[in-house]
C-alpha cells in the first residue's frame, strides 16, 4: 500500500500595504498551493489575532519586519504553536547599515524567529554583525515583489504605453516629514533627526520641481504618486491645482509604471522596479553631499542635481535622444538575489520545507496547550463574536479584501503560467482568506 503523503503546514503571510504587497502575496500563494501547501492572507492585525487566540492551525507565520516592537508579538505567536519567519519589506532601501540596524532590527526579536529572509548579499552583510550567533537563521532569497517583474508574470503588467501623451511619474518618499494624518512619527537620535530635516527640505524642492515640469511640459501627463505612509492631502494641496497633473496612488506601482515614459524619484524602491521594466529613471538629488540617497535606487538611476538638468533630461527622452544607462545587472544581483535565477518564492518555500523536515526544530505543542487554545477560542467567540474595527490609517493602506478579488488575480496569474493550476479560495474567518493546497482540491 503506497505511503500517504504528509500534510504540509500552512503559511500565514499577512498584508500591511495593499498597493505594495497584494500581488506578490497572491503569486506566492498560487505557487505555494501548487507545491502542496495552503496559504492564509489578510491584514496583519487580523492574521495575528487569529493566530494568538488559537483559532488557526499551527503553521509558518511570515512577518514584514524584525524591529524591537515585534518581540512580544513573536513570543505570543510562537507560544500558540506557530513558527515565526521574517521577510522585511524595507530591507532593500535604507540610508545606511547603522540606520537600518538601529530602526528596524532587534536581536531580542530574532530569538523567536527561525528564518530571516534577506533581499540579497548586501542586506545579509549589513545585518550579520548584529545577528552574531544567529547566522544559520539568515537565508538570502530575494523578495516575491520582484518575482512579479520576471517572465512570464511581467506580461500581466505591460502594454500600457500605446498612448498619445508622454507620461511623467513623480514618486515621493517623505513619510518621515509628511506622515499620514493621525500617525505619529518618533524622532529618535541624531541620525533620524538629520533624516527628518533632509526629507522636509526635499519635499519643498520636489514641490518646486513639479511646478516647473508642469509649466515646461503642459501637454504631458504628469502624475504624482505619494508613498503609502505619506499624507496624500499634502500633495493635493501643494500641486493638485495644476491642470495637467493628477495625484494618486491606487493599485500597485508597477501598473502605474507600465504606462510611464520617465520616472523621477529620490531614494524610492519604485526606481528599481522601473529599471527592471525598462522605464527611464531620474534620481533628483539637489542636496549635496547626500548620504541619504545611497543604495540601489541611486545606482540604477540617472542622477540629476538641478532643475535645468531635470527639464533637459525629460526633453531628451521625449525626443528619443537620451542615451540609455549602462547595464548594471551584477550590481542589481548583489542587492536582489532573485534578479535572475530561481524565483524568490521558490527559494523561500525550499527553506521552509527544509525547516519543516528538520527534526530538532519541530515544535510539539503539549496536549494541555492545545486544550487551552480551544478554550481560549470559545471564550473569545463569546466575548467578541464580531471583528475588531481597524483604524482609518490602516484602512487607507489596506482596504478590506474580497474573495472575488483574490480569485480574479489568481486566475490572471494562472493564465500567464500554464504550469500552475487554479486553487480553491475560502474565507475561514472574517477578512482572512485561505488559498487551498491543490492537493486538497482533488
What do the predicted segments below correspond to?
Residues 24, 119, 198-206, 340-344:
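Soluble or luminal CAZymes and related metallo-dependent hydrolases
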Residues 40, 62, 85, 115-117, ...:
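Hydrophobic/aromatic beta-strand patches that form the interior of the parallel beta-sheet core
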Residues 2-3, 7-158, 171-173, 177, ...:
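Active-site and donor-binding regions of nucleotide-sugar-utilizing enzymes
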Residues 312-442:
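C-terminal amphipathic helix plus adjacent low-complexity
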Residues 152-238:
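Conserved catalytic-core segment of nucleotide-activated headgroup transferases in glycan assembly
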Residues 223-272, 276-277:
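Donor nucleotide-activated moiety binding/catalytic core segment of transferases
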Residues 240-242, 269-340:
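Catalytic binding pocket for nucleotide-activated donors in carbohydrate/polymer assembly enzymes
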Residues 51-52, 71-73, 94-99, 148-153, ...:
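Short, charged, surface-exposed secondary-structure boundary motifs
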Amino acid at each position: 500500500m503506497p505511503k500517504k503523503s504528509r500534510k504540509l503546514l500552512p503559511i500565514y503571510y499577512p498584508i500591511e500595504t495593499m498597493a505594495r504587497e497584494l500581488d506578490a502575496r497572491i503569486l506566492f500563494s498560487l505557487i505555494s498551493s501548487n507545491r502542496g501547501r495552503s496559504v492564509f492572507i489578510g491584514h496583519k492585525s487580523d492574521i495575528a489575532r487569529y493566530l494568538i487566540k488559537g483559532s488557526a492551525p499551527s503553521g509558518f507565520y511570515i512577518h514584514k519586519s524584525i524591529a524591537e516592537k515585534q518581540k512580544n508579538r513573536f513570543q505570543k505567536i510562537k507560544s500558540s504553536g506557530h513558527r515565526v519567519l521574517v521577510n522585511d519589506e524595507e530591507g532593500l532601501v535604507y540610508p545606511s547599515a547603522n540606520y537600518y540596524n538601529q530602526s528596524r532590527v532587534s536581536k531580542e526579536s530574532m530569538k523567536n524567529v527561525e528564518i530571516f529572509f534577506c533581499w540579497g548579499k548586501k542586506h545579509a552583510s549589513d545585518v550579520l554583525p548584529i545577528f552574531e550567533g544567529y547566522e544559520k537563521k539568515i537565508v538570502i532569497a530575494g523578495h516575491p515583489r520582484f518575482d512579479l517583474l520576471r517572465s512570464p508574470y511581467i506580461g500581466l503588467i505591460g502594454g500600457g504605453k500605446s498612448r498619445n501623451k508622454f507620461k511623467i511619474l513623480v514618486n515621493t518618499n517623505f513619510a518621515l516629514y509628511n506622515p499620514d494624518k493621525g500617525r505619529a512619527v518618533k524622532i529618535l537620535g541624531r541620525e533620524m533627526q538629520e533624516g527628518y530635516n533632509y526629507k522636509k527640505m526635499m519635499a519643498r524642492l520636489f514641490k518646486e520641481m513639479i511646478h516647473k515640469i508642469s509649466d515646461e511640459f503642459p501637454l504631458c501627463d504628469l502624475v504624482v504618486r505619494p508613498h503609502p505612509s505619506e499624507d496624500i492631502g499634502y500633495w493635493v494641496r501643494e500641486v493638485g491645482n495644476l491642470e495637467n497633473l493628477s495625484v494618486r496612488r491606487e493599485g500597485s506601482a508597477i501598473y502605474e509604471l507600465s504606462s510611464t515614459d520617465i520616472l523621477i524619484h529620490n531614494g524610492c524602491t519604485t526606481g528599481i522596479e522601473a529599471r527592471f521594466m525598462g522605464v527611464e529613471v531620474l534620481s533628483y538629488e539637489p542636496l549635496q553631499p547626500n548620504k541619504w540617497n545611497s543604495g540601489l535606487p541611486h545606482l540604477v538611476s540617472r542622477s540629476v542635481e538641478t532643475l535645468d538638468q531635470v527639464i533637459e533630461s525629460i526633453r531628451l527622452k521625449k525626443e528619443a535622444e537620451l542615451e540609455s544607462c549602462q547595464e548594471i545587472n551584477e550590481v542589481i544581483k548583489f542587492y536582489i538575489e532573485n534578479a535572475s535565477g530561481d524565483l524568490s518564492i521558490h527559494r523561500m518555500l525550499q527553506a521552509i520545507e527544509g525547516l519543516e523536515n528538520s527534526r530538532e526544530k519541530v515544535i510539539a505543542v503539549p496536549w494541555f496547550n492545545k486544550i487551552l487554545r480551544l478554550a481560549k477560542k470559545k471564550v473569545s467567540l463569546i466575548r467578541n463574536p464580531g471583528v475588531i474595527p481597524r483604524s482609518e490609517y490602516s484602512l487607507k493602506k489596506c482596504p478590506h479584501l474580497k474573495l472575488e478579488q483574490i480569485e480574479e488575480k489568481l486566475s490572471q496569474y494562472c493564465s500567464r503560467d500554464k504550469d500552475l493550476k487554479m486553487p480553491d479560495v475560502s474565507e475561514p474567518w472574517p477578512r482572512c482568506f485561505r488559498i487551498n493546497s491543490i492537493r486538497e482540491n482533488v
